[in-house]
Amino acid sequence: MRIMGLDVGDKTIGVAISDLSGTIAQGLTTIKRSSNKKDFERIKQIINEYEVGMIIVGLPKNMNGTLGPQGQKVMRFVEHLKEAFSIPIILWDERLTTVEAQRVLIEKADISRAKRKEVIDKLAAVLILQNYLDSQKNK
C-alpha cells in the first residue's frame, strides 16, 4: 500500500507518495489550488493511479502546540477530505517542515529563489510523509 503526504497551503498543495513498502517518500507534484472540488478531483486521480491506501496531511501548529489560522484552515480542508474519501486520513505535526525544506534547497541543492518557490511545497510534503514513515518503523 502506498501512502500519500499532503502539504496544504492557500495557493498550492504539495504532494508526496511513498514506495510500496512504506519506507521512502518522494515528491510527486504540486497542485495549484482552485476549489475543493477540483483539488479533490486531482487528489482522487493520484489515489487511483498510485493505489493510495492512506493520506497523511501536515498540520501547521504554532511552536507552543496551538493551532493558528493556517492550522484551522487545514482542519477544515481535512474535514472535507474525509467526507470525499473513504481511506484513513491522519493529521501530522508539520512544525518547521517548510523551514527545513527551504534550508535543504538553499544549502544542499543551491537552488535559486524562483526555482525554490516551485518545489518548496512538494519538498515539505516529502518531509511530512517521511517523518510519518520513520515514526512507524519504530513501532
UniProtKB/Swiss-Prot annotation:
GO terms for cellular component: cytosol. Signal peptide: none annotated. SUPFAM superfamilies: Ribonuclease H-like (SSF53098). Its EC number is 3.1.-.-. InterPro entries: RNaseH-like_sf (IPR012337), YqgF (IPR005227), YqgF/RNaseH-like_dom (IPR006641), YqgF/RNaseH-like_dom_sf (IPR037027). GO terms for biological process: rRNA 5'-end processing. Keywords: Cytoplasm, Hydrolase, Nuclease, Ribosome biogenesis. GO terms for molecular function: nuclease activity. It is an enzyme of class 3 (hydrolase). It holds the Pfam family RuvX. Its main location: cytoplasm. The keyword Hydrolase applies. It is found in: Cytoplasm. The keyword Signal does not apply. Could be a nuclease involved in processing of the 5'-end of pre-16S rRNA. HAMAP family: Nuclease_YqgF (MF_00651). Belongs to the YqgF nuclease family. This is Putative pre-16S rRNA nuclease. It comes from Thermoanaerobacter pseudethanolicus (strain ATCC 33223 / 39E) (Clostridium thermohydrosulfuricum). The lineage of its organism: Bacteria, Bacillati, Bacillota, Clostridia, Thermoanaerobacterales.
